[in-house]
């Protein structure tokens, strides 16, 4: 019976839904609050706290189709991808889970029913493995299900390994939940080489594991002892690619429908006719991991998750180049992938434009990196004294510039050099070892504080509440009492204190009793409990005491305003920059807010201004901030946006601000948008590739920010004015100096008319103030005489006349300057000894000055 991959996925989820399981959406490829994982690599990752007993959900049975990535860290399939039938960087894990509900018998029965009745796989093609000492599982398979004993294989511990170190015994870490597992294998037939599990030939491809059922029934302590869990659980996983290959009658995962569409599209884009080329498989696999990682917020970078993504992209591009791809090609496969993945690609379709842009930019940048790498490689070859390029240089080219070793080898061979392959492999192995060490769990889960109590939050409508102390912890250990000075965690039965979540910081305040005062400095979630972190300031506090829990209301109010502002900011950014904008993190404090979002370019000043305008417009409209409780599906249908990386219960709080913003949010908010008062962005910048950060303030802090900005502008204006005055003074001093020098030169042009010294001159570039200074200087130098100076500045004529006192009875400066002014289209006058005028006809100035001698002669 043929089934497409999409049909297999839907059949699996529907089957387990019919068995009372809650269908839970695939979680992000970026693990939520789990620093032990680089990427989500199994279906159980999002339920880890449920298995650990730190979280309780509304359901005890769940089923998922989880997107997974294994590349980098402890689980790294990258080097094998494309060269085997079943290695992938990206895959989907179908799973069903029981949290203290059903156990081995039901889990095994469900698996067998789905495989043999829903998928109708031949029973004689299936065989199973159990842990060597798990007689219970063996008997269920043999006696309840009816699998012949010769098709049930017991798998023990690995030779030379530790106890329980077996393919059929699962552990979460060095300590914590663990247990045996049973695996189901499919026999592809005698025509394919390979042996049954547990035989020397088990690595062959005949018998393929398709489903693993893990039975968490023990808690392993640090000393190695196994304690039975009071409520054992079930974690199962079945790779959709493997089961789809069986349902589609093919042997290799790369032959299933999803991969065939991608392989054919790649071949068409790069111009490859050989559809069996392994490079096509590499590209088809890598476009899946790269696209979904970017859609989940990972951006190419040089560290952490971003570095793994960059390596995968470059590996795909390199294989495209090997196939002869011309120009960028990788991003063109995103649309093909979204179509091929069916219902699993709903989020990818929303992010398609962003994913394509990120891939295109990264591929273009890699082209430039290749060019730089070639320069370094050729320089290294030129500097060689021998004929072998050392492994460290080869590794540097690979690790720093993304230069594949095979390309380095090709270039070296063309120039009759060889490369030190052993040295390169050594450097690579050292890097792998570092990655493995970084990816190890190494976590003692028993060291985590476990609280059986469940706190009820009652702080949406109140900041003060009477409550009972249900648990106390000092340095991770539970205690019955606290003494003054103890730094501790207090758990209350119910509390108005909000625990840090969704970017909103935890509340602070006090817990009061008749005999003590506990200062709450922070509030955090601890499983299903709310932990009040702080110090007992005075008195004593004991488990069972009744306290009055009082939240710092003023601080809470400031936080709520900033939290509501982040919702408006998010909506405004999506309007201004585009629907691709998604929240990647936030921090909401009393003092300010910080908002991280996906965007590939710096936000321009004009865009920031428009974002501010939109937010403040919504504040002025004073929308009521409404909260509605509804199921998650109804919230999605309403268009509510979910926060990146957050986990939500079946029932969620939907926060609406008019028709401008609708988001899922469990935080504390203002009553109306008008309460925010004012919104002001204080900074914008990039924090990672494709991730921007905006910091902003609201209310009084926004006014202070605007006032500070205004003061800054005023200071800058005053500084500019002072500088201008200083420059003007300096310029005038220079002009005076020039005038003094010019007057010295003009003395040589003095002539005598009727025994009187006369100076007539045209001086371009000098202003009127400079001319006056020159006239005074010339008078002093001449002792007795008549002076007439003219200049042209900005097409305007300036005139000034000076007459020493002994000659003013015969020649008056005012009459002289007026005579000249009339000839240049102006007029003027002044005292007998000094007068000035202006005119508009600069072309007439030479002839006007030429008439001065005759005019003076007539009057002497």
UniProtKB/Swiss-Prot annotation:
EC number: 6.1.1.7
CDD domains: AlaRS_core
Keyword set, alphabetical order: Aminoacyl-tRNA synthetase, ATP-binding, Cytoplasm, Ligase, Metal-binding, Nucleotide-binding, Protein biosynthesis, RNA-binding, tRNA-binding, Zinc
Cystine residue pairs: none
Pfam families, sorted: DHHA1, tRNA-synt_2c, tRNA_SAD
A GO term, aspect molecular function: tRNA binding
Biological process annotations from GO: alanyl-tRNA aminoacylation; negative regulation of DNA-templated transcription
Top-level class of the enzyme under EC nomenclature: ligase
Annotated stretches, region: Disordered: 824-843
Cofactor notes: Binds 1 zinc ion per subunit.
Catalytic activity: tRNA(Ala) + L-alanine + ATP = L-alanyl-tRNA(Ala) + AMP + diphosphate
Names of the cofactor(s): Zn(2+)
Subcellular location field: Cytoplasm
Database matches in InterPro entries: aa-tRNA-synth_II/BPL/LPL (IPR045864), Ala-tRNA-lgiase_IIc (IPR002318), Ala-tRNA-ligase_IIc_anticod-bd (IPR018162), Ala-tRNA-synth_IIc_core (IPR018165), Ala-tRNA-synth_IIc_N (IPR018164), Ala-tRNA_ligase (IPR050058), Ala_tRNA_ligase_euk/bac (IPR023033), DHHA1_dom (IPR003156)
Keyword presence, Cell division: no
Positions with a binding annotation for Zn(2+): 563, 567, 665, 669
GO cellular component: cytosol
Function text: Catalyzes the attachment of alanine to tRNA(Ala) in a two-step reaction: alanine is first activated by ATP to form Ala-AMP and then transferred to the acceptor end of tRNA(Ala). Also edits incorrectly charged Ser-tRNA(Ala) and Gly-tRNA(Ala) via its editing domain.
Family: Belongs to the class-II aminoacyl-tRNA synthetase family.
HAMAP family given in the database record: Ala_tRNA_synth_B
The record's note on its domains: Consists of three domains; the N-terminal catalytic domain, the editing domain and the C-terminal C-Ala domain. The editing domain removes incorrectly charged amino acids, while the C-Ala domain, along with tRNA(Ala), serves as a bridge to cooperatively bring together the editing and aminoacylation centers thus stimulating deacylation of misacylated tRNAs.
Protein's UniProt name: Alanine--tRNA ligase
Species this chain originates from: Vibrio vulnificus (strain CMCP6)
């Amino acid at each position: 019976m043929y089934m497409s991959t999409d049909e297999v996925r839907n059949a699996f989820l529907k089957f387990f839904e019919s068995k009372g399981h809650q269908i839970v959406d695939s979680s992000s490829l970026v693990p939520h609050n789990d620093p032990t994982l680089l990427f989500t690599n199994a279906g159980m990752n999002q339920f880890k706290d449920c298995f650990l007993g730190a979280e309780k959900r509304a359901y005890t049975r769940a089923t998922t189709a989880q997107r997974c990535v294994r590349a980098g860290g402890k689980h790294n399939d990258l080097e094998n991808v494309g060269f085997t039938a079943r290695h992938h960087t990206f895959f989907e894990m179908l799973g069903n889970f029981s949290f203290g509900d059903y156990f081995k018998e039901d889990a095994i029965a469900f698996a067998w029913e789905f495989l043999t009745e829903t998928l109708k796989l031949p029973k004689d093609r299936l065989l199973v493995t159990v842990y060597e000492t798990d007689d219970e599982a063996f008997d269920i398979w043999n006696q309840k299900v009816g699998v012949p004993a010769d098709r049930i294989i017991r798998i023990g511990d690995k030779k030379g390994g530790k106890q329980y170190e077996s393919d059929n015994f699962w552990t979460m870490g060095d300590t914590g939940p663990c247990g045996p597992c049973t695996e189901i294998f499919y026999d592809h037939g005698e025509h394919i080489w390979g042996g049954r599990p547990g035989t020397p030939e088990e690595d062959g491809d005949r018998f393929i594991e398709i489903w693993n059922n893990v039975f968490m029934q023990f808690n392993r302590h640090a000393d190695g002892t196994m304690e039975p869990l009071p409520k054992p659980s079930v974690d199962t996983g079945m790779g959709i690619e493997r089961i789809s290959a069986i349902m589609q009658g093919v042997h290799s995962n790369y032959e299933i429908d999803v991969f065939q569409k991608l392989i054919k599209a790649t071949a068409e884009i790069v111009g490859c006719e050989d559809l069996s080329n392994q490079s096509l498989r590499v590209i088809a696999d890598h476009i899946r991991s790269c696209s979904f990682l970017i859609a989940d917020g990972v951006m190419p970078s040089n560290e952490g998750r971003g570095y793994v993504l960059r390596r995968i992209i470059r590996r795909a591009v390199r294989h495209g180049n090997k196939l002869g791809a011309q120009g960028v090609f990788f991003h063109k496969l995103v649309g093909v992938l979204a179509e091929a993945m069916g219902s699993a690609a709903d989020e990818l379709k929303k992010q398609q434009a962003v994913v394509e842009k990120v891939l295109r930019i990264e591929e273009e940048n890699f082209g430039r990196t290749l060019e730089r790498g070639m320069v370094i490689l050729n320089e290294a070859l030129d500097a060689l004294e021998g004929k072998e390029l050392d492994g460290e240089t080869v590794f540097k080219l690979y690790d720093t510039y993304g230069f594949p070793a095979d390309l380095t080898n090709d270039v070296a061979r063309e120039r009759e050099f060889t490369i030190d392959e052993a040295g390169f492999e050594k450097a690579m192995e050292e890097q792998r070892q570092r990655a493995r060490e970084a990816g190890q769990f190494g976590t003692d889960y028993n060291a985590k504080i476990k609280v059986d109590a469940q706190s009820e939050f009652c702080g949406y409508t109140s900041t003060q509440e009477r409550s009972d102390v249900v648990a106390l912890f000092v340095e991770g250990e539970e205690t019955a009492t606290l003494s003054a000075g103890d730094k501790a965690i207090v758990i209350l039965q119910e509390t108005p204190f909000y625990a840090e979540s969704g970017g909103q910081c935890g509340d602070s305040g006090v817990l009061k009793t008749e005999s003590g005062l506990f200062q709450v400095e922070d509030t955090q979630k601890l499983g299903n409990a709310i932990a009040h972190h702080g110090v007992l300031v005075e008195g004593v506090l004991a488990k069972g005491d009744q306290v009055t829990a009082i939240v710092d209301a003023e601080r809470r109010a400031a936080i709520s305003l900033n939290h509501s502002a982040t919702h408006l900011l998010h909506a405004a950014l999506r309007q201004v920059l585009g629907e691709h904008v998604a929240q990647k993190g936030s921090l909401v404090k009393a003092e300010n807010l910080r908002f991280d979002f996906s965007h590939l370019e710096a936000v321009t000043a004009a865009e920031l201004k428009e974002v501010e305008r939109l937010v403040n417009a919504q504040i002025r409209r004073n929308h009521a901030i409404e909260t509605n409780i509804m199921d998650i599906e109804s919230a999605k249908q309403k268009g509510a946006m979910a926060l990146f990386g957050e986990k939500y219960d079946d029932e969620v709080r939907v926060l609406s601000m008019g028709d401008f913003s609708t988001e899922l949010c469990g935080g504390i908010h203002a009553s109306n948008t008008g309460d925010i008062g004012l919104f002001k962005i204080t900074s914008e910048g990039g924090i990672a590739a494709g991730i921007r950060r905006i910091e902003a303030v609201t209310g009084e802090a926004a006014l202070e920010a605007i006032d500070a900005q205004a003061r800054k502008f005023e200071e800058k204006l005053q500084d500019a004015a002072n500088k201008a005055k200083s420059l003007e003074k300096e310029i005038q001093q220079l002009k005076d100096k020039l005038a003094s020098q010019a007057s010295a030169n003009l003395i040589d042009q003095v002539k005598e008319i009727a025994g009187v010294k006369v100076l007539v001159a045209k001086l371009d570039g000098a202003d009127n103030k400079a001319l006056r200074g020159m006239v005074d200087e010339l008078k002093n130098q001449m002792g007795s005489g008549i002076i007439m100076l003219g200049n042209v500045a900005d097409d305007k004529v300036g005139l000034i006349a000076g007459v020493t006192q002994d000659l003013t009875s015969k020649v008056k400066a005012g009459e002289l300057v007026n005579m000249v002014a009339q000839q240049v289209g102006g007029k003027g006058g002044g005292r007998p000894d000094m007068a000035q005028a202006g005119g508009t006809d600069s072309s007439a100035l030479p002839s006007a000055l030429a008439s001065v001698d005759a005019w003076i002669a007539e009057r002497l």
